[in-house]
Every structure is written in C-alpha cells, then in structure tokens.
Amino acid sequence: MSKKMQTQEEHHEELVKGLYEQMKTVLEGSEQPIFIYLDDNHKACNSKFAALLGFKSPEEWASIEGFLEPYVAEKSRDTLMKAYWDAMKKMVASTSQITFMKKGGGIVNSTVVLVPVPFQGHLFSVHFVTNAVS
C-alpha cells in the first residue's frame, strides 16, 4: 500500500504547525505579540498578536488570505518587505517601525524585530512586536 503524497499546501501547513509547537513555550509565555511567517497563506501568531489586531483568536487571524494588504499599513509595506528579504537572503535580523491595520479599522504603531529562523529545510521569519500603540 503506497503512502499518500502530501501536497505543497499540506506540507506548508504542517511546517507552520511544527514550528509553532517547537516555539510554543515562547509564543504562549512571552509578554510580546509574536507571529511566524512562511508565506502569505502559511502563518501563525500568538493570542497577544491576534488580540492586538482585533481578532478573537490566532486561528481567525491566520485564516485571512494574504499578509501585507490586510495587515500592514501602506506606508510600512516597503519597510517590512525589505526587512523580510534581508532576513531571507542575508540571514540578518532587523528592527523596523511598522504600522499594522486592525480588523474593523484603526492602526497600531509598533517596533518589529524580525528574525530569520530555519525549520525543516525552510526559512521562516519570526516577528516580535514591541512598543505597540493604537
């Protein structure tokens, strides 16, 4: 009997769950809002980040397709994209001033520390949010 081939979508979902489990102590114990990003549709966050942006749960936050358009104010998109690509290509962490958009309106100004994190052959970006002010 052959084993069912896993789709790329299933594989990426499994990776996000795996990294979340590996980082669970930090994600659930930290006072900071934190999110993990593989790509626009494969991401996770802790309850503090979900609440910061007005979501009832991390699952509700992660279910929204995309990333920059629904969550990041237009003025911060280039900054966050540059920080992300520097992390992915140069393996460098960074600190940036980012304005997030809240569900249902409003904004949150914050400082984001973005760190590249390898997991099972894939490179994620892990974002620690500080100094968040609505």
Question: Can you say where each PLM-predicted feature lies in the sequence?
Answer:
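Short, charged amphipathic alpha-helical "coupling" segments at sensory-output junctions
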Residues: 7-22, 134
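PAS/PAS-like sensory domain cap-loop motif
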Residues: 49-62
